Amino acid sequence: MSTIVLILALLLTSLIAVGLLWWLRFRRPHPITAALPFVKLTHRKLTPEERVSIENYLRNQQNKHGFNTQPAFDSHALAASTSSTPMLVLTPQSDNVYSVTRAITRYGVASDEPNKWRYYLDSIEVHLPSAWEQYITQDNDVELIQTQTIPLVISLNGHTLNNHQSENTYQPILPSVSKNASIRKEDSEHIELLNIRKETPEEYALHGPNGLKEACAICIALLLLFFALSGPTVTLPWLVIVAVSLTCWACWYLFRPLSEKDLREVHCLNGTPKRWGLFGESNQGQINNISLGIVDLIYPAHWGPYFVHDLGKKTHIDIYLNRQVVRQGAFLSLHDEMKMFPLQRWGKNLTLIVGSLLVLVLLLIYVPLGLPLKLSVAWLQGAQSQQVTSVAALDKMPLRIGDMLKAQGNGMCYVPPNIQNTRGFVFTPFDCSGIYWNTASPLPQPESETIEKAAALVETINKQLHPQGSDASVNPKLATAIEKSGMILLDDFSDIVLKTQALCSENTDCIRLKNALVNLGNAKNWSALVKRAQSGNLEGMNVLLRPISADVLENLINTAASSFVYRETHLATEALNSPPPGGFLITSDEGKQLVNHPAPTLPLFDYSALEQWRELQRLSALLLDTPFKAEGIITNITTDANGTRHIALHSEPDIVTLGRYLATSLLLLVLIFCLVVNMVLLIQRAMKNRRRMDNIQRYYDDCFNQTLTPPPFLR
């Protein structure tokens, strides 16, 4: 898990670093894109012929008009009674030709100069040769270059300065335009520019950023914090720094105050809006063919039933430079709509819900949260340190989760109730990561008569099948002859029968072993064989066995004895799990040993049956009453049915681990808070958005005090 988290964390950090470098590199505006934001960075170079034509045109303009230097687009010049044409001076950047397809907006200026028009691409003023006005269409293919002041148009819809003649030789502009032209006749209504203002924050909110990028950045920051808390320590500070930086950047762009640079310009005009048939297209929607003088107006779609009240009347109209209407008349206002019925953007809330839920699921799956939460709460409340050496002192001491406890004394190692799950303990079946500590006498060591009988049976069969030295009860010559023949002699068959009966006293015990002994003793049944042995009739009876038969008999006896030994060992182990009631059970939730004894060389269950019993007795003598030392932070306190108080301890964490615990708890709270808050906001905003247009229409209906219907088409 740690390797996967490390790889993912490093990969994600690298991607974010590359993304930030790319963003910092390309966010710096190119000189031409700073002046003309709509222009792409692709360009071509001026040809020598174009260069000569441009210089001739500029020289001709300088000879004909006296240019005064003026910076690019001074919006107040539109309202001035006199305005001068800005000087056009080529610069080294003028060798780059940029192509763009845009609508050209023309404004008239009250002036005595022959050229009283100003031309704009979006909100940027450009210099357009006046003779090319007749070539303007709705969408224009424009080539332009940058000059010292404003961009110069060198090509318009295929017309270039290469074939440009002196303006003195141009024919007068026809009063009517072609059917595809977007410029009205000269006798169109005069537009009065009242002033130019910045849009309001409410108007900006309609087209401003929706916060999705910032929400995604916050989600990535939360994911980085998860990787930092679950990954190795070496990556923790770097991931935290990146996550905090992303969060600060996102929060700044979400909640920062608007600057003048963010707000677009709004032109406040006074004129008579009229409906026209544009470009020979009479089938356009009625909302798309309203003009104020030469300016084609673009209305919000839901204003359709209302803006017709001002058609043919002098009225105030506020528009963006892209001809989008912001306010008209006394009632129609995007500012008022946003103020009374705010637009509810819920995309960022949905993004934060998905991101928070993803990180929360990862946190619940891969990070244990119980201990960090407990230690964090205890740290905030202020933990105390307690030290005891007796049960009585611990019993009187007020304990709470998060306190530091140091206990030392003599107690009994804990024995789990299920012996099958004790194979992983150092002192199996004892689990010395838990200590029973009370004032009662220690439990007695395990003893069993059944195991003693089994050991006696195994001992006698081993002694007879594997004799050590010569047996005085057997004739030496007979023993030598038997050994040469390869046979094995049982010289005390009666003892085997009696000890088998002592161990297997029930009729259902040791069936196979009893049958084998009956056959060897040539008896009718087991009861008859036992009676003969008890009466002494089998005294001095020797039994000869082939080696195979001897091995079979030995295996039968060992199997029968082992079954009794295992059963008794299990019962004795269960008896060790019955400590006296009361007292304390102190455990380490990390599995640390609380005693200082060397570990056994072999686990208990790797021994044979009888060796297991002997090892259990040795461990019992060692661990039923043993010195212990336990210290750590209390993570849990419970009391069982016997009145024993269970105290779980965890080693005191270092500063880095404690910081991880606190940060994990804080991240969990942040995720839950973010999830709940954004779910509530998502539901509220979705419901308000569903009713927003109905509320706006109801508001306008009340303002105009009538039910409006689309008027007939005006020609």
From Swiss-Prot:
Entry's localization field: Cell inner membrane
Keywords in alphabetical order: Cell inner membrane, Cell membrane, Membrane, Transmembrane, Transmembrane helix
The organism of origin for this protein: Yersinia pestis
A single Gene Ontology CC term: plasma membrane
Annotated coiled-coil segments of the chain: none
Transmembrane segments: 2-22, 214-234, 235-255, 349-369, 663-683
Top-level taxon of the source organism: Bacteria
Family that this chain belongs to: Belongs to the IgaA family.
Protein name, as recorded: Putative membrane protein IgaA homolog
Membrane topology of this protein: Multi-pass membrane protein
InterPro entries reported in the protein's UniProt record: IgaA
Pfam families xref list: IgaA (PF07095)
Keyword hit for Ribonucleoprotein: no
